[in-house]
Amino acid sequence: MTDISPLDQARILSEALPHMQQYDEETIVIKYGGHAMGDEETAKNFARDIVLLEQTAINPVVVHGGGPQIATMLKRLGIQSEFAAGLRITDAATIEIVEMVLAGSVNKQIVGYINEAGGKAVGLSGKDANMVKASKTTRTIVDPGSNIEKAIDLGFVGDPEKVDLTLLNQLIGYELIPVLAPLATSKEGQTLNVNADTFAGAVAGALKAKRLLLLTDVPGVLDKSKKLIPQLSVKDARKLIADGTISGGMIPKVETCIYALEQGVEGVVIIDGKMQHAVLLELFTNQGTGTLIHK
């Protein structure tokens, strides 16, 4: 039984219809974060929402993270994790675990939930069919003792350089739902771990997606009084980074949004992935949810 009256159900559908028409046959890239995955019921609700998108003539492409799951496995195996510039330092032993968790465990679990909900999902990583080529990430940090910048070696961590859409376009054409683990291959054939937000931005940009949704563990971009900012232009987003309003882990997320917009994505939204049906609320309601960043 539902507590929603028939009249309210009709109003909900009436509100959703123009949004469904707006996204008809469009591609939506959804980055599903490790923290946003939540518990099993939340994950299954997410899967049902993805299937609903496909059934309403939208082309969903899911990119997932897996930071918490990787950390759990590394701890179980007694491998210490180190971070620099917000990125995991990934040595040869760690990249094997990262690939096992992302491509072998997390990816297949999401695929299973989507298929259980009636969809036809296909699990892949950026390594498959050389979909995503990347170069090793270079970062610098300031040494606190000398105040001198120095380069740091992050190991097998990469930044996307090229996305080959051949396989993705075929899957979308067959009405299959791609679920992508953020792994890529270097020109030397090495496996590289790519930040999931960055990976999703590169894929969305290559696909010229209508929307990129970044599901996170926060409601969106917050102002200095911790209130949600519903919309931001790229110009305003850069100002908020400069004045410190956008800080910490939100900076690379917003930078990913800006990059995706520059590559041709129409709009990027940072939303709270722990909220039930966050994807549907963003796409199919007038108010939406989270922070929309646009040109």
Swiss-Prot record:
It comes from the Bacteria. It is found in: Cytoplasm. It catalyses: N-acetyl-L-glutamate + ATP = N-acetyl-L-glutamyl 5-phosphate + ADP. Keywords: Amino-acid biosynthesis, Arginine biosynthesis, ATP-binding, Cytoplasm, Kinase, Nucleotide-binding, Transferase. Its EC number is 2.7.2.8. The keyword Nucleotide-binding applies. Substrate binds at residues 66-67, 88, 193. Its main location: cytoplasm. The record marks 31, 253 as: Transition state stabilizer. It is an enzyme of class 2 (transferase). Catalyzes the ATP-dependent phosphorylation of N-acetyl-L-glutamate. Belongs to the acetylglutamate kinase family. ArgB subfamily. This is Acetylglutamate kinase. It comes from Bradyrhizobium diazoefficiens (strain JCM 10833 / BCRC 13528 / IAM 13628 / NBRC 14792 / USDA 110). The gene is argB.
